[in-house]
From Swiss-Prot:
Protein encoded by which gene: mltF
Gene Ontology biological-process entries: cell wall macromolecule catabolic process; cell wall organization; peptidoglycan catabolic process
Family: In the N-terminal section; belongs to the bacterial solute-binding protein 3 family. In the C-terminal section; belongs to the transglycosylase Slt family.
Membrane topology of the entry: Peripheral membrane protein
Region (Non-LT domain): 34-264
Protein's cellular compartments: Cell outer membrane
Protein name: Membrane-bound lytic murein transglycosylase F
SUPFAM superfamilies tied to this protein: Lysozyme-like (SSF53955), Periplasmic binding protein-like II (SSF53850)
GO molecular function: peptidoglycan lytic transglycosylase activity
Organism: Marinobacter nauticus (strain ATCC 700491 / DSM 11845 / VT8)
Length: 502
């Protein structure tokens, strides 16, 4: 018995020492924020969406991404981005504490309380029901009894619609393989009659889908949030909350919200009156530069001027939050490559734009005849050569001619839909933009040619004839010239909203 007591006391003493060491070690463990600073990396997981994260001219951008980049800079660490297939993957990774922050474009949900912590990011959204214009317009969920409502997987909408007690309620159909653009495209084509989407994603995509109408909201606007694993301590969440408060107070958050949500970037265009005013008042300052550098590059100066107008409205001090700047809106990488030192100098910018367009034009295969080769070059100037090649490959795989702009422009918008861009080499792109970009430059060029020819009408005299340069020219009601066929008849239904080019 005494031996047992002695052994027990000895074991107890050893156990006490071990426990003391464990407790001491636990107390000295670094916090989440300390671990991030020691590693020098902030790990975020996100998905591709125009409201969250995407690449524009080969640069990462997006509202959530820009905030995360600023946050990482403030912490003095590298931002490392992992791109998930969908929200289900983001939530799974966070639940296992395999990332520091999740950028999912979600609002706080009841089922998040015990799994994730959240920090508002200064933008709100609500769940809305949309429908194809040719189906009955619903006013409430009661009008959708026994109808199918389509939505993305792990979205905010299901818990607002599902009612186990109501067997006659709407049928919920979730689509893990789709993104918001793909969902809206199916409503546009009539494949889906009704869908639930986030209002911010509808706002950013609605211009492309004019047959998709908004019916009603399922809830009041709620803050979009960043999500943090519940397994973390408070330090990173507290730092994020303090950061959000600072960027809100200093105006940075408002600037980002205006850029990504206040307008549709390149998809809202000035009307004829403004364009002709700039032709008369701005163009003369730079016309000789356009002529000189266009001649050096072997191109029509009016085409170079049209590119400049589309890029900056001929403003030499134009600056984008992504770092693109100057009259021709050159990236720093492009400027360095072609030997331009000051992008805000009008002459250097025009010279750089002419050089760069000549380089881009030279990459387009010689076998492609004009003017298609120029249209391809313009699209590449806007969206990048890699994305253009992706669209050409998609066109070829569908039995279309990859050397015809009329064929390839059908496939560029598909690069914004997950089911398509995941099959390409260069991934997501806002593929509608180069289509409208080329269209507008052709229109501006056509006007410049007309007013610079002998016996041409004055700029002011053309205003009333240029209704097709109106504010909504990217929308479905933009008329084409009567002498031109409507090429939309040959497009897939979800792409017929793209106005015909001149």
């Amino acid at each position: 018995m005494s031996r047992f007591i002695s052994t027990f006391r000895s074991s107890s003493a050893q156990l006490s020492i071990v426990l003391a060491v464990i407790l001491a070690t636990g107390c000295s463990q670094p916090t989440t924020l300390q671990e991030i600073r020691e590693e020098g990396v902030l790990h975020v997981i996100t998905r591709v969406a125009p409201s969250i994260y995407y690449q524009d001219r080969e640069q990462d951008t997006g509202y959530d991404y820009e905030l995360a980049r600023l946050f990482a800079n403030e912490l003095g660490v590298e931002l490392r981005v992992r791109v998930a297939d969908d929200n289900s993957e983001i939530l799974s990774v966070l639940s296992r504490n395999y990332a520091h922050v999740g950028l999912a474009g979600l609002t706080q949900r009841p089922d998040f309380d015990n799994q994730y912590r959240s920090v508002p990011i200064g933008v709100s959204a609500q769940s809305v029901i949309v429908y194809h214009k040719e189906v009955p317009a619903p006013e409430s969920l009661e009008d959708l009894a026994s109808e199918t409502i389509h939505m993305l997987a792990d979205s905010n909408h299901e818990h607002l619609i599902a009612d186990p007690a109501n067997e006659a309620g709407p049928i919920i159909q979730k689509h893990p393989g789709l993104d918001a653009a793909g969902l809206l495209a199916r409503v546009e084509s009539g494949e889906f009659g009704y869908a639930a989407v986030a209002s911010n994603e509808l706002d950013l995509n609605h211009v492309f889908f004019p047959k998709v109408y908004e019916a009603f909201a399922l809830n009041e606007p709620s803050d979009l949030v960043w999500l943090f694993p519940a397994a973390q301590d408070d330090t990173l969440v507290n730092a994020a909350e303090a950061f959000m408060e600072r960027v809100n107070n200093n105006g940075t958050m408002a600037q980002l919200a205006e850029r990504f949500y206040g307008h549709l970037d390149r998809l809202n265009y000035v009307g004829a009156r403004t364009f002709m005013h700039h032709v008369e008042n701005r163009l003369p300052r730079y016309q000789s530069l356009f002529k000189d550098y266009a001649q050096e590059s072997g191109m029509d100066w009016r085409l170079l001027a049209a590119i400049g107008y589309q890029e900056s409205h001929w403003r030499p001090n134009a600056v984008s939050p992504t770092g693109v700047r100057g009259l021709m809106m050159l990236t720093r990488t492009t400027a360095n490559y072609i030997g331009i030192n000051n992008r805000l100098d009008a002459e250097e910018s025009i010279e750089g734009g002419a050089r760069y367009f000549r380089m881009v034009h030279g990459r387009i295969p010689d076998r492609i005849p004009e003017p298609d080769r120029t249209w391809f070059a313009l699209a590449s100037y806007n969206v990048g050569f890699g994305h253009l090649e992706d669209a050409r490959r998609l066109a070829e795989s569908a039995g279309k001619d990859p050397d015809r702009w009329m064929d390839v422009k059908e496939f560029l918008p598909l690069l914004a839909q997950k089911e398509w861009y995941t099959k390409t080499r260069f991934g997501y792109a806002r593929g509608h933009e180069p289509v409208v970009y080329v269209q507008n430059i052709r229109r501006y060029y056509d006007v410049l040619v007309r007013i610079t020819e002998p016996d041409a009408p004055s700029a002011s005299g053309l205003e009333d004839q240029l209704a097709w340069l109106g504010d909504n020219e990217a929308g479905p009601e933009a008329p084409a010239k009567e002498s031109q066929p409507d090429l939309r008849a040959d497009l897939p239904p979800e792409l017929r909203l793209i106005p015909p080019t001149l």
